């Protein structure tokens, strides 16, 4: 009986811990993460204080923090080829990272680190040097900076069959040296690395290439981590938020369902589906059942995004900053519709898949610069600073915990819906105007459209909509309007 009771208790503890790993630990009503891709730590700290905190962003996903291989031309993907777990990269050193985490936490913006637990670097001819000066011999699987030796890796093999579980989880993803996460030594070094980041105040982790690691191994690693650091404003016994990169298009041998109980999972079907819809390949009317109705994961288990740093570089349905009108419309819908744990992208300009982040002649990453309206101008795209996007972050905060109601569509690609009695969104993706009296569900009054402008000193700088005593307002979105969206919420009432 004692053994049975003990087993039950252990199962309950594990289940509780797993559930806790779905909690992103946001402040107040904040509920949107931004990925500041390849930004320096000092610049992220300033952005938290000057923009993200005041605009109500909940958190930042940062690029990998540990030492990586130095590759010719400094492509972005060198950050995904570890040499050691020393906290020195082109984004800064450990002191600068710790300062950034502290400053962001102080203004209510949580930090989530992109971590590489699956592998080390790819092959390199001879001695490779990392961003902290560590040397390694990747061809011999020798990484003294950790240290790892060949005994800590799976035997080398290529992934040629993506339906072969052994290949997917024990062979080398694009030639990257594949760690053996069942090894006690490897586990200890990974846990030590993650625990150090927790000590510095991070709120959680985006786990790169999670599907290439056995779920049981990841479960052991996650459950062995320390609680979050209460000195950074986290409650006692808070567990790190985990969201895992698992690419699953619905026909994968290694599926998302193996990982969604361990933490949230990146819902790539969301990205593809929303891209298809706003590119005009699917009528927007079908988005009424968006989310689980489309076969997506349960809302609290899905990390959702229009694009990410990988798929924005691929040809296909996925939208990126190069299609700005459709991208802003898709992002507005993403942040208005009550599904998923939302992340928005903040990119740098690229002409090909390997383009490096903006850098100077010494190959040092440069800081973003801003024009008089706050937009980035020197190679950084900064979608999160586009008014149409940061305004929808505010919309999402204003309508948090409300339900979708009063869906309307024209049978094609003009849609609208309410979020409780706090918000209203209308979208026009047709080649003709939307001009319609629509139920906004809002209290009577005049509301500023936060897409075309904002509420400043008691008046609207863009469009406005007058809502009558029955909740109806006249919405007009021209087919040739700069933006195909209209958004109203209670915090933008005149």
Swiss-Prot record:
It is found in: Secreted. One of its GO terms (cellular component) is extracellular region. Ca(2+) binds at residues 118, 169, 178, 212. It comes from the Eukaryota. This is Alpha-amylase-related protein. The lineage of its organism: Eukaryota, Metazoa, Ecdysozoa, Arthropoda, Hexapoda. GO terms for molecular function: alpha-amylase activity; metal ion binding. The gene is Amyrel. The modification Pyrrolidone carboxylic acid is found at residue 21. Disulfide bonds join 48-104, 157-171, 376-382, 418-441, 448-460. Binds 1 Ca(2+) ion per subunit. Binds 1 Cl(-) ion per subunit.
């Amino acid at each position: 009986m004692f053994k049975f009771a003990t087993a039950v208790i252990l199962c309950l503890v594990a289940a509780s811990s797993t559930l806790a790993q779905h909690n992103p630990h946001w402040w107040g009503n904040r509920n949107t993460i931004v990925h500041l891709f390849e930004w320096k730590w000092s610049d992220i700290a300033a952005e938290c204080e000057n923009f993200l905190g005041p605009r109500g962003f909940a958190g930042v996903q940062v690029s990998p923090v540990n030492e990586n291989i130095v590759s010719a031309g400094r492509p972005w993907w060198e950050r995904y080829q570890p040499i050691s777990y020393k906290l020195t990269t082109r984004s800064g050193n450990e002191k600068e990272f710790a300062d950034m985490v502290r400053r962001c936490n102080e203004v209510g913006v949580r930090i989530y680190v992109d971590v590489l637990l699956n592998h080390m670097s790819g092959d390199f001819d001879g001695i490779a040097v990392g961003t902290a000066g560590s040397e390694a011999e990747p061809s011999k699987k020798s990484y003294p900076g950790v240290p790892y030796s060949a005994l800590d890796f799976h035997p080398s093999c290529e992934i040629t069959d993506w339906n072969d579980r052994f290949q997917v989880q024990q062979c080398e993803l694009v030639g990257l040296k594949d760690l053996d996460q069942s090894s006690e030594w490897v586990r200890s070094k990974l846990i030590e690395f993650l625990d150090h980041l927790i000590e510095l105040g991070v709120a959680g982790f985006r786990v790169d290439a999670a599907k290439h690691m056995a779920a049981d191994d990841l479960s052991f690693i996650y459950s062995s981590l320390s609680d979050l650091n209460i000195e950074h404003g986290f409650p006692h016994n808070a567990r790190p938020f985990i969201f895992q990169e698992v690419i699953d298009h619905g026909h994968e041998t290694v599926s998302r369902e193996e990982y969604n109980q361990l933490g949230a999972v990146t819902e790539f079907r969301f990205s593809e589906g929303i891209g298809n819809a706003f590119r005009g390949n699917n009528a927007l009317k079908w988005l009424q059942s968006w989310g689980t109705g489309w076969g997506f994961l349960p809302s609290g288990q899905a990390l959702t995004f229009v694009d990410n740093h990988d798929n924005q570089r691929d040809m296909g349905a996925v939208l990126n900053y190069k299609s700005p009108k459709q991208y802003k419309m898709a992002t507005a819908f993403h942040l208005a519709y009550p599904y998923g744990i939302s992340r928005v992208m903040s990119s740098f300009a690229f002409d090909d898949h390997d383009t490096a982040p903006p850098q100077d002649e010494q190959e040092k990453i440069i800081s973003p610069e801003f024009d008089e309206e706050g937009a980035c101008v020197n190679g950084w795209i900064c979608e999160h600073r586009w008014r149409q996007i940061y305004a929808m972050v505010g919309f999402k905060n204003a309508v948090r915990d409300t339900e979708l109601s009063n869906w309307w569509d024209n049978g094609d690609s003009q849609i609208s819906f309410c979020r409780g009695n706090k918000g209203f969104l209308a979208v026009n993706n047709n080649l003709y105007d939307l001009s319609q009296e629509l139920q906004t569900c809002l209290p009577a009054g005049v509301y500023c459209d936060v897409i075309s402008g904002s509420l400043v000193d008691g008046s609207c700088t863009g469009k406005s909509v007058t809502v009558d005593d029955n909740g109806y307002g006249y919405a007009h979105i021209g087919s040739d309007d700069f933006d195909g969206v209209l958004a109203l919420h209670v915090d933008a009432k005149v």
